[in-house]
């Protein structure tokens, strides 16, 4: 739930005529799920003590933990290491950190670094953390739906999501597949109804 997500929903809605934007404004709890707050991250950078940029959200959205809270401080390598996601088995990969999306009431700051970059960090160095972000609980939550009515009310639901930034196969592809299915079903008569959500 961020400005990038809202932009994606608005683009989706413009492209698929007849789809509908849904805005939920009151924070809700359904079973154990709580409506996720709007996260506005203007900047996220990790620099060394010489002020040299190591990673930034501007270069790669996956570099910062999603829903990372605001922080601006200098830390030693031992502290930084606790807030780094990396994988030696995928040395070039910037891995998506999603924990905060499911525990947004207790977010942690951090960065995702390719292992090849992580192993070059100097253990004796200090590092500058600057994440400019805030949470807006009352901004609401945006969603979209695209309905193809059939003769019956019984509905098949096709679900996709935009909550994984910069990842086509785990977000965008599912959304587009669902909406394309509805778009094509609208050209024929169907017994059942179909909803992309």
Regions found by a protein language model. Give the residues of each.
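N-terminal hydrophobic/helix-forming segments and targeting peptides
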Residues: 1-197
């Amino acid at each position: 739930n961020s400005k990038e997500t809202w932009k994606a929903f608005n683009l989706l809605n413009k492209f698929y005529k007849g789809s509908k934007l849904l805005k939920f404004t009151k924070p809700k709890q359904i079973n154990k799920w709580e409506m996720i707050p709007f996260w506005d991250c203007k900047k996220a950078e990790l620099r060394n003590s010489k002020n040299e940029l190591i990673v930034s959200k501007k270069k790669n959205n996956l570099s910062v933990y999603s829903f990372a809270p605001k922080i601006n401080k200098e830390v030693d390598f031992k502290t930084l290491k606790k807030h780094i996601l990396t994988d030696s088995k995928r040395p070039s990969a910037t891995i998506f950190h999603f924990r905060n999306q499911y525990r947004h009431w207790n977010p942690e700051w951090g960065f995702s670094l390719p292992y090849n970059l992580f192993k070059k960090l100097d253990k004796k160095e200090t590092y500058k953390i600057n994440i400019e972000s805030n949470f807006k609980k009352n901004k609401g939550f945006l969603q979209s739906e695209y309905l193809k009515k059939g003769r019956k009310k019984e509905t098949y639901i096709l679900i996709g999501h935009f909550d994984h930034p910069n990842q086509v196969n785990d977000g965008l592809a599912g959304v587009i597949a669902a909406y394309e299915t509805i778009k094509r079903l609208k050209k024929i008569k169907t017994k059942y109804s179909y909803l992309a959500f």
